[in-house]
């Protein structure tokens, strides 16, 4: 670990982690300025998405980050919920059932809105045991 990565992790957990219990979802949004402030390198945000899944009852965790050239999404899930399907259908991405990535050419705010607008489509799957 670098000191910058540890500081970014602390900042994210304290200030940026959002929880939507009605969707059993946690998400993090990071701006380009926030990534720059912590001297974030590619890969520094990779493990952050997993913190959301460590919260009791959470089945979907997403990090949305502004990488200047586009907006990147990293999606992780527990159980049978397929983040691969969500990433492929809505975020030009894909991967595996429980780990996927995506991207958009929308703004950061538009991407967050799209993610929040898409969640209700998956509510039944997310709240199923």
Where do the language-model regions lie?
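Hydrophobic helix-and-loop "lid/oligomerization" segment in the mid-to-C-terminal part
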Residues: 1-90, 95-129
């Amino acid at each position: 670990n670098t000191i910058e990565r540890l500081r970014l992790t602390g900042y994210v957990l304290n200030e940026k982690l959002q929880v939507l219990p009605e969707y059993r979802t946690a998400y993090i949004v990071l701006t380009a300025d926030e990534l720059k402030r912590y001297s974030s390198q590619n890969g520094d945000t990779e493990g952050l998405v997993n913190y959301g899944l460590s919260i009791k009852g959470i089945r979907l965790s997403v990090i949305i980050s502004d990488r200047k050239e586009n907006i990147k999404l990293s999606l992780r899930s527990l159980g049978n919920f397929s983040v691969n399907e969500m990433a492929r259908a809505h975020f030009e991405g894909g991967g595996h059932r429980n780990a996927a990535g995506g991207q958009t050419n929308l703004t950061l705010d538009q991407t967050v809105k799209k993610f929040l607008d898409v969640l209700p489509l998956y509510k039944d799957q997310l709240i199923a045991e």
